[in-house]
UniProtKB/Swiss-Prot annotation:
Signal peptide: none annotated. Monomer. Substrate binds at residues 148, 180, 217-220. This is tRNA (guanine-N(7)-)-methyltransferase. The gene is trmB. Pfam families: Methyltransf_4. One of its GO terms (cellular component) is tRNA methyltransferase complex. The active site is at 144. Pathway: tRNA modification; N(7)-methylguanine-tRNA biosynthesis. It comes from Buchnera aphidicola subsp. Acyrthosiphon pisum (strain APS). Belongs to the class I-like SAM-binding methyltransferase superfamily. TrmB family.
Amino acid sequence: MKNNIITPRYNLEGVFLRQIHSFVCRKGRTTTSQLSAIKKYWSLIGVDFQLNALNFSSIFKHRAPIILEIGFGSGESLVKTAMNFPEKNFLGIEVYKSGIGSCLHYASSYQIQNLRIIYYDATEVMYNMIPDDTLSKVQIFFPDPWHKKRHHKRRLLKNIFLKIITKKLIIDGILHIATDSESYAFYILDEIKDIKNYKNLSEKNNFVKRPVSRIITKFEKKGLLQGKKIFDLMFQLKK
């Protein structure tokens, strides 16, 4: 498992890489059990970052629709979703080591076979590792809203990243976003409105009801108890 989750200033081809990231590398505490899970199970479930496109048939045991989740947090809901849909393959991306360890622990506990995870910056993974026209669904649940205006440049779901996703989804593939930030929800709608390939699946062209397939996370439960409203956005890729 590689510990460097951000590519250098230039990649191996000498191409200048972006410097503004949608996350901050905090020195969060990784527990002993999380470190143990990484040591035991990374070789089975983890996928190291690389500068060339993945061959999904080489990392998954069975050919199946691929669902990508960006920023899976503890991984508990991702693992449970993978368990609920064994006929699909799941790929998760996370930048925090504690989340990687936690996800590996859950996956090993449930003996999940249809899940692989990457410990790296999602934008670099999308640029370098995800082949075009391969994903049946991309789900991004509760990304950091970066509330302060001067930090909006750090937001993951900007127009440029949303356009990258269109290249990775298959036709009729789904982009599903959930956030508890109303301002971020409307920001996303504004960023995506000019990308003609996306069809908003909301009848009112804004938000949809939470689908049963999206498991309510501990983070979400806490927010609901505090009276926060959850916004689900769902788009389908069209020709």
